[in-house]
């Protein structure tokens, strides 16, 4: 019931296997369904992640796909097992900015449609705000703050969270950023 989507679609897909082989692998390993059922499941999951028509993708190899298409294959490989919980290790950080939002929207829609929950690991607070209902901030390998997304971003408590939020660049120079009184000595003492 637990699966993972890796950060780098260029490294997480076997370059010697076709897209069909890559997505079939978990079904084959766990001996799920017969050959026809497995083939049908692969076609359906490709449609689900927006790789249509599926027959155009099945015989191809990862190097023949764009970064966004590769990440869709990674998502398909993960979801073919019908997990309830997916660990997402920065699944959009290796993608072109123009593709990121479409992958994030796909993941959000799939979470609703397939009733999947994500643990979304990211260093990008803008992505966390877009993707997450709750955020946990880690400092030195420990969770130091957990809150609803907007609550954490608007009213951080831990000094590291405050420092992290204060470091986010603001594209509008006339924007007045909320200034946090950060005690750097206190933060350094936590290290």
Name the predicted role of every residue range.
Residues 128-130:
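A short, surface-exposed alpha-helical micro-motif characterized by mixed small hydrophobic
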Residues 60-65, 69:
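Conserved ABC ATPase signature
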Residues 80-84:
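A short, proline-enriched helix->beta-strand linker immediately N-terminal to the Walker B motif
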Residues 75, 103:
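Hydrophobic anchor residue at the start of the ABC signature
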């Amino acid at each position: 019931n637990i699966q993972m989507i890796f950060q780098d679609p260029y490294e997480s897909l076997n370059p010697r296997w076709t897209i069909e082989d890559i997505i079939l692998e978990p079904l084959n390993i766990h001996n799920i369904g017969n050959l026809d059922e497995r083939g049908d499941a692969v076609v359906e999951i490709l449609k689900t992640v927006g790789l249509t028509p599926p027959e155009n993708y099945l015989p191809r190899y990862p190097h023949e796909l764009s970064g966004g298409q590769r990440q869709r294959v990674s998502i398909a490989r993960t979801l073919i097992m019908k997990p309830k919980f997916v660990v997402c290790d920065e699944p959009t950080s290796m993608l072109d900015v123009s593709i990121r939002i479409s992958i994030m929207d796909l993941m959000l829609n799939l979470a609703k449609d397939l009733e999947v929950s994500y643990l979304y690991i990211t260093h990008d607070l803008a992505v966390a705000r877009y993707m997450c209902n709750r955020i946990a901030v880690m400092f030195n390998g420990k969770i130091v703050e957990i809150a609803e997304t907007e609550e954490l971003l608007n009213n951080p408590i831990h000094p590291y969270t405050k420092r992290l939020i204060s470091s986010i660049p603001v594209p509008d120079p006339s924007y007045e950023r909320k200034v946090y009184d950060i005690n750097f000595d206190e933060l350094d003492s936590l290290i």
